[in-house]
Amino acid sequence: MARAVGIDLGTTNSVVSVLEGGEPTVITNAEGARTTPSVVAFAKNGEVLVGEVAKRQAVTNVDRTIRSVKRHMGTDWKIDLDGKSFNPQQMSAFILQKLKRDAESYLGEKVTDAVITVPAYFNDSERQATKEAGEIAGLNVLRIVNEPTAAALAYGLDKDDQTILVFDLGGGTFDVSLLEIGDGVVEVKATNGDNHLGGDDWDQRVVDYLVKQFANGHGVDLSKDKMALQRLREAAEKAKIELSSSTETTINLPYITASAEGPLHLDEKLTRSQFQQLTADLLDRCKTPFHNVIKDAGIQLSEIDHVVLVGGSTRMPAVAELVKELTGGQEANKGVNPDEVVAIGASLQAGVLKGEVKDVLLLDVTPLSLGIETKGGIMTKLIERNTTIPTKRSEIFTTAEDNQPSVQIQVYQGEREIAAYNKKLGMFELTGLPPAPRGVPQIEVAFDIDANGIMHVAAKDLGTGKEQKMTVTGGSSLPKDEVNRMREEAEKYAEEDHARREAAESRNQGEQLVYQTEKFLKDNEDKVPADVKTEVETAVGELKEKLKGEDSAEIRTATEKVAAVSQKLGQAMYANAQAEGAAPGADAPGDAQAKADDDVVDAEIVDDEKDTKGGAA
């Protein structure tokens, strides 16, 4: 059986690992290194260079060297070279092809199956793009796995009942995840992150600082010189790495550029303290995702058994100190190599999928809630955020109008209670509903998220069996900044949303009661005394009038009045029945009806018993 590899496709570096005798091994590349730079270059003769060789020639071939392509995954970014257009999937595929070749050379056999990792906060389009890159590279992508989850899998395989915090700061992305490990099960409890925060940003701050210092000293703007900028980037990365182990470094770049007076040289000292001041706000951006994860998981800091640092950027002393401070003084686990742990976890997951690793179950999560818009503009969640995937959830909804021929299913992603404030992923219509009173049709809406985090939605009329489906793909997933904005807004406007939801529910209850009471009066016209009928009709008329306005308190009061006077209908019916010596007749709204009305909320989701509750239109 062909072996499957685990690939950590990183922003700055990539790693490939394989199981040998059940133990994960990091594969050494053709250059003798265990990590491969995620750099692609096109030589002047048209040859495609990947990895260390591409990185080495970058200064003299700036325009034809592409790095950090992971930051463009899932976007419409393109680069034109030699009359050809390349997208991020193709660029990533060049890197994956090299990793595939190195693995084949090491193993002495063909490699086709792979598990590829992505940041936990990658959205649908970014995951799709990663999968496509693997396919372009000739790989059969068995699974897309979240990086922190893979790290925990690598770390926690032989551990019992522990809670692990994974702090993953790579070259271009940042994730925090909280996982529980026990009895061979690795379960993600919560995850959060920032897809545009990583070591590249720290490098850029040093580049900006050097450009400013050089402009002040020589009056020349190096940011306009592509070749000089490339040298600055490499020097900044080197300085950052040196400052992790020493308190001061010198950046010396002779012949960086030239002026009318002749060649100019850059010679700058940079202390660790200066570096930390330049990047203090980047460090601050790591705090919010951390706090969100602790809050979402609903645990105390004292309950965290181990802290695992992942990604080369966690080697920066300021980052390690921040993690220690955030976790209440806990020392991070030093038993894992932050550069390799994700690939090791990916190879273990590949082993699980191929049946080589037994008794391990990996339970990943979806980072945002998913639902549909229901009557009153409410967001009715079918799948809550941090739900384990793969998952399938279905609920029964109904129509809001008599003889409604179709229902619109509008799919949203986010945490706000009002649908319009969330991210709309798409919509479709279920048509051809047979004529029926409102509340009668039963429409089953099903959400299905597969193990790769890709979503499918279906709506089915249980009466006719008609079904409509939709797959959420491409650019429909959420960008990182939208996710963060939604989370912050959800907390900020929680009270306002709650009030709006209550108002919508009050209106729905009022409309439902008007409909039921009028129908009852019509069906039992000859059995209701005139005075009772007049009193009920007056109360219903008042409620209808209030429903034209926006005052939810008045609507609630009028609804309660109708519920109270409608009890007289039941009393009158039973009195008539007893007078005639007959058994009680038709059901009256009465207490039972009023109570039912309290339960009937058009936007509410329903249990597996298939009770009809919400209006889906």
Curated annotation (Swiss-Prot):
Keywords recorded for this protein, A-Z: ATP-binding, Chaperone, Nucleotide-binding, Phosphoprotein, Stress response
Annotated region described as Disordered, given as residue ranges: 489-512, 579-617
Residue ranges, compositional bias (Low complexity): 579-593
Ranges of Acidic residues composition bias in the record: 599-609
Residues modified as Phosphothreonine: 173
Metal-binding in keyword set: no
Classification via InterPro entries: ATPase_NBD (IPR043129), Chaperone_DnaK (IPR012725), Heat_shock_70_CS (IPR018181), HSP70_C_sf (IPR029048), HSP70_peptide-bd_sf (IPR029047), Hsp_70_fam (IPR013126)
Single GO MF descriptor: ATP binding
Any one Pfam family match given in the protein's UniProt record, by short name: HSP70
Keyword GTP-binding appears in the UniProt entry: no
Biased composition (Basic and acidic residues): 489-505
Domain of life: Bacteria
Signals that turn on the gene: By stress conditions e.g. heat shock.
Similarity remark: Belongs to the heat shock protein 70 family.
Record function comment: Acts as a chaperone.
HAMAP family: DnaK
PANTHER family referenced in this protein's UniProt entry, alphabetically: HEAT SHOCK PROTEIN 70KDA
Name recorded for this polypeptide: Chaperone protein DnaK
Annotated source species: Streptomyces griseus subsp. griseus (strain JCM 4626 / CBS 651.72 / NBRC 13350 / KCC S-0626 / ISP 5235)
